[in-house]
């Protein structure tokens, strides 16, 4: 998996068409209304649903007020530069409510839980779980077979573009409500205790805790047993 360069992301956002997509329920004498090809119209003679850019649909509503007697607008963004990731081809378990921007890479058999938020340029390795309400900022990178606990934050770095993003290496367990600041690398096999604030690199195969986080011991068999990654949670249905 390739991490996006910050300048690539900045250029993508700068050049992207800023959009305000809406979904509009309408009713009225709709056989008298003409809809342009740029608006998706699923209508019959009396009611229907429109999908499209707000500026275009508003023109339709204003110009046909004598035919459209009522409407309701659903709108969740304004001048948005980054679309949501198309999830249909992702070989991972992604639960309802996860917010995942375009240009995010998700490895096979990863798990993204409810209300996780993953920003552009983030990378999630094979078999890693991003738990409920966790936040992965821009370009944050998580290796293979990791667990990022509920409410944890991996700080994002898009600007300044020279800044180093958070890197979590393979087989890492990050506890609930941990904050990992930009530029930090969490070494392979490490464990970050719940609630820690990580301001410096974490050595491989160590346990860190506290604010700021400090090494409290090396990984031992007891720690391994308490932080075991369960592959059963990452299994998908056999492909048909």
UniProtKB/Swiss-Prot annotation:
<dbReference type="Pfam" id="PF00132">
    <property type="entry name" value="Hexapep"/>
</dbReference>
<comment type="function">
    <text>Catalyzes the transfer of an acetyl group from acetyl-CoA to tetrahydrodipicolinate.</text>
</comment>
<keyword id="KW-0457">Lysine biosynthesis</keyword>
<dbReference type="Pfam" id="PF08503">
    <property type="entry name" value="DapH_N"/>
</dbReference>
<dbReference type="InterPro" id="IPR011004">
    <property type="entry name" value="Trimer_LpxA-like_sf"/>
</dbReference>
<keyword id="KW-0677">Repeat</keyword>
<dbReference type="GO" id="GO:0009089">
    <property type="term" value="P:lysine biosynthetic process via diaminopimelate"/>
</dbReference>
<dbReference type="InterPro" id="IPR001451">
    <property type="entry name" value="Hexapep"/>
</dbReference>
<keyword id="KW-0220">Diaminopimelate biosynthesis</keyword>
<keyword id="KW-0012">Acyltransferase</keyword>
<comment type="similarity">
    <text>Belongs to the transferase hexapeptide repeat family. DapH subfamily.</text>
</comment>
<dbReference type="GO" id="GO:0019877">
    <property type="term" value="P:diaminopimelate biosynthetic process"/>
</dbReference>
<dbReference type="InterPro" id="IPR050179">
    <property type="entry name" value="Trans_hexapeptide_repeat"/>
</dbReference>
<dbReference type="Pfam" id="PF14602">
    <property type="entry name" value="Hexapep_2"/>
</dbReference>
<protein>
    <recommendedName>
        <fullName>2,3,4,5-tetrahydropyridine-2,6-dicarboxylate N-acetyltransferase</fullName>
        <ecNumber>2.3.1.89</ecNumber>
    </recommendedName>
</protein>
<keyword id="KW-0028">Amino-acid biosynthesis</keyword>
<comment type="pathway">
    <text>Amino-acid biosynthesis; L-lysine biosynthesis via DAP pathway; LL-2,6-diaminopimelate from (S)-tetrahydrodipicolinate (acetylase route): step 1/3.</text>
</comment>
<dbReference type="InterPro" id="IPR018357">
    <property type="entry name" value="Hexapep_transf_CS"/>
</dbReference>
<dbReference type="InterPro" id="IPR013710">
    <property type="entry name" value="DapH_N"/>
</dbReference>
<dbReference type="InterPro" id="IPR019873">
    <property type="entry name" value="DapH"/>
</dbReference>
<keyword id="KW-0808">Transferase</keyword>
<dbReference type="GO" id="GO:0047200">
    <property type="term" value="F:tetrahydrodipicolinate N-acetyltransferase activity"/>
</dbReference>
């Amino acid at each position: 998996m390739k991490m996006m360069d910050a300048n690539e992301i900045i250029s993508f956002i700068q050049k992207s068409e800023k959009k305000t997509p809406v979904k509009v329920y309408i009713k009225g004498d709709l056989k008298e209304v003409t809809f342009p090809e740029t608006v998706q119209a699923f209508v019959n003679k009396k009611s229907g649903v429109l999908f499209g850019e707000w500026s275009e649909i508003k023109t339709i509503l204003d110009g046909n007020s004598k035919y459209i007697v009522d409407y309701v607008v659903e709108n969740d963004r304004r001048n948005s530069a980054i679309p949501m990731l198309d999830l249909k081809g992702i070989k991972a378990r992604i639960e309802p409510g996860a917010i995942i921007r375009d240009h995010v890479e998700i490895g096979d058999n990863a798990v993204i839980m409810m209300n996780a938020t993953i920003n552009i340029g983030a990378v999630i390795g094979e078999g890693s779980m991003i738990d409920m309400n966790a936040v992965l900022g821009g370009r944050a990178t998580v290796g293979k077979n990791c667990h990022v606990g509920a409410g944890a934050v991996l700080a994002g770095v898009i600007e300044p573009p020279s800044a180093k993003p958070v890197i979590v290496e393979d087989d890492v367990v990050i506890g609930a409500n941990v904050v990992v600041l930009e530029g930090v690398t969490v070494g392979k096999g490490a464990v970050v205790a719940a609630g820690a604030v990580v301001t410096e690199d974490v050595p491989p195969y160590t346990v860190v805790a506290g604010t700021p986080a400090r090494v409290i011991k090396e990984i031992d068999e007891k720690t391994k047993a308490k932080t075991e990654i369960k592959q059963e949670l990452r299994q998908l249905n056999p492909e048909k």
